[in-house]
Amino acid sequence: CHNVIKQTNYQITNDETFRNRANLYLAQDKEKREPYSGETKVMHYFELLRDVVGFDKIKEKVVNPLTGRKIAAYYGCLLLRPGKVMAFDDPENPAIMEEFIRAIGAEPVIYPYRNECCGGYVALEDPDSAKKKSNAVTNSAESHGAELAVTACPLCKYNLVHNGSNIPVVYFTELLAEALGVKEDTNA
């Protein structure tokens, strides 16, 4: 999970005690492992698409624009929080997924529950609570005109789909592949 990796890297970089404990743990696998100090930049795929590839470049490469499709971006609670650590969009008023939706030719739907929790890992202990949270998200998206929802978190997708969403929920790479004209490999 991007959230766990990024938070761990942040702690290794900023907390000497944590860094020492992590390096002791890692050294168990290999005697001569170099200590890790957090020098790797952890990026989400959306950061890569926006900051390295560029949404303008993606827009240029679209061969199958998703024109007329109303898509609700679902951020959930793990993609952008804690904001100080994730630090690639505003956790209270995010825009990166809406920019992506526009780049592939669709219309983003703004709705109140787009950065609320879907139930996350709570689904393991309290499925009813996760179902209630997930349904609040998809019902909100649908009532604001969305015909489908897109997410960047596999756990969010699982919760939204398996808790009875009335609208389809897809992973963002599915929309990207569709817009770029990538054919599904049925032999994979």
Describe each PLM feature range.
Residues 1-188:
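Iron-sulfur cluster-binding electron-transfer modules in prokaryotic oxidoreductases
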